[in-house]
């Protein structure tokens, strides 16, 4: 709806902008509402000391008739010289605030009452608070000259690069930015784009991108945009729900910059910004929070109004929450002028707290009754088979010491009716507290194993009888053995808190980084991973993705990708996934058929990590895992082997059953071997619980050996 040519005609004559009376003009436009011919005539010949005219201020609203506000101030004086227009717009937009009242600032984080709302990370994904500021002694963004913009950049960068501690970081100028840096800032969601048509018409994009840039700290929790819509957008953010911590970091940074450079401020307007909508605090305090039930509650809008907050989808204004983000909303303060920064944050905090209480009430009500959807005929899960209404009622009110409930364990199977298992344990205690359910599922899945028997572990590679099956490489392409493990003293992955996940990452990386010899390598955290590293890990088939809908519903994906990462050795034959489905997936692999060598390397690594950290284990369950299917050894030992004749043999499935192995295509479960991979199968052990790791590997070895004998003998 931009029409710069028509606007230019009126501007060149310094005439009243008739396009504002066009039916296409937004009827809610504030410049349309308050710029009467009389007001225009009284102001049209005035200029600020920096040369800003009335037309400079209204041009964006005349060019873009769909504007909501429609004016931008070119400098501090614009707010007083053109007060008859600006004052009316400001008091309308920020109603019920009156400019005569005066604005007070408060950047003391101690004044906010904000204990962590969601330490278990069940609802709040992330927190972000930003303020807009403009330096004293310069025009606002639309009125800044090129020389002044460069001067602002130099001064601000000087202050930012002097910051220490958790605020210390690096500045990235947009001018001359190389592609690698640009891509990294895009991946981190830190890069800002050239302003839209509204900012273009206001004069904010002049000499783009010169004098613009991005500063962020080493932890990527503190960010400053230079010379975007305002001189400074100062941002503090982090995964999780510690609103107090995020505000505190912001206050320390803002107060330090203000002390050294000074911000434009008046008693009536608060901190000055180019757009009147950002006056006062210039603050937007927000969280991304999952509240699908609260959103549907009849009191939802009343709570928004009561606490002066607003809700939108997490992908920007007017966006909807869909897909994996369904039910996740961006909740932020609505007021900016006439209350302090502390009050803005408190508004948001109190409002989110009230919405979370609604959500918790709705969830508690839902979880108090048996999930009738499990009775649908298409549901074939073990959860459906064993969870009766009577059993549900006997367990529904119990919670582990870490706060895990029965419904936490069954939620994935209730949300995903095509689940085969349907339960995930949130911590070790789930296996005993909810044993009347878990025991049946475990014994069914791992039949004929009985939990009354004792599971024994054996990670001694010398006990495997596994001479190289295919030294010429005619049949076996590759060998891979992995185990799932979880560290003692923590919840299992679905029940981890943010701090626990980060602590596990730190501890495990410490151990992995101390490994020597053929196990020595490097850790690659998923958070902040640059594109070149990401692509390398993709090419090596080492990168893991965010968990699927089953893991999402189980709570495994919380605060993704924070605390997750990949370690691999220099030879690329030893790999560890940290905080994926389990806290550790430890993998040994290599081209060819030396199963004994692959298992030997795995044993050395697993035994060393176990010695330093310790793994969760019980006599009945073996090594613990979030999903009961991975209990016991947590092992999958496999080869990719070309056996077109053996796979066509009438006894193929019988042999697989006899040796407790399973066959599938090499591209994952349910895949079929076709094309150049025709006849190539992934052969792996089927049993995990009730036999040792040595026995799992021996099962796979013996089964593959038998299949190769058939392959070689079949004409």
Swiss-Prot record:
Any Gene Ontology CC annotation: extracellular space
Pfam families cross-referenced by the UniProt entry: ATP-gua_Ptrans (PF00217), ATP-gua_PtransN (PF02807)
Enzyme Commission identifier(s): 2.7.3.3
Catalytic activity: L-arginine + ATP = N(omega)-phospho-L-arginine + ADP + H(+)
Domain Phosphagen kinase N-terminal: 11-95, 365-447
Cysteine disulfide links: none
Binding site for substrate: 68-72, 229, 275, 317
Domain Phosphagen kinase C-terminal: 123-362, 475-714
GO BP of this protein: phosphocreatine biosynthetic process
Name of the molecule in the record: Arginine kinase
Organism for this UniProt entry: Anthopleura japonica (Sea anemone)
